[in-house]
């Protein structure tokens, strides 16, 4: 518990400090591929109009906005993040979108009732949570039976040429971007290590299953640099079945 608390405080500090440059940093680090990946994930999700969605670790609300457009005026989207400064950036971007609500909260202790959402997403945020399984179990808890959870995250490339390039990029190029946009060595080192140490696609699939998700689907993007994991909360069985 003490370790988790220290880790939370460290991550909170990082994102409080990089909030104003986060979007720019994300675009540069991913060569704007994160936008392409998100569009492909949204296509896989086939979000229904009028749905209620939760975007965990919403950051500056990019995925929250995409979900808002997908659910339409009759739907509702809540974006949750633990960084007040990240949410301030998100609030500016979503101020004219009436079906979005942004709230501060902890991904490991979601402030919502059981069985509340049709969709729960987390984009490039799971790697920054001290305990992946606790966060995934919380996502499962707040989903309605049969609801969909989706994670878009960096991954570990399996194709040799991508794997070598990825390792070189993280070792030599990413620190340069970090120094330009982060305010301290600790911040850019965290951004680098959290992505580099994140589970590969098969390991994360196993964690999804451990958290209770069924029919978990996995899609890799750009040679495995990023991956989508999509799973469902088990449907309730009718009494007498």
From Swiss-Prot:
Residues engaged in binding S-adenosyl-L-methionine: 60, 81, 106-107
Keywords: Menaquinone biosynthesis, Methyltransferase, S-adenosyl-L-methionine, Transferase
Top-level EC class as recorded in UniProt: transferase
An annotated Gene Ontology molecular function: demethylmenaquinone methyltransferase activity
Transferase listed as a keyword: yes
Catalytic activity reported: a 2-demethylmenaquinol + S-adenosyl-L-methionine = a menaquinol + S-adenosyl-L-homocysteine + H(+)
Keyword match S-adenosyl-L-methionine: yes
InterPro entries from the UniProt entry: SAM-dependent_MTases_sf (IPR029063), UbiE/COQ5_MeTrFase (IPR004033), UbiE/COQ5_MeTrFase_CS (IPR023576)
Function per UniProt: Methyltransferase required for the conversion of demethylmenaquinol (DMKH2) to menaquinol (MKH2).
Protein known as: Demethylmenaquinone methyltransferase
Gene: menG
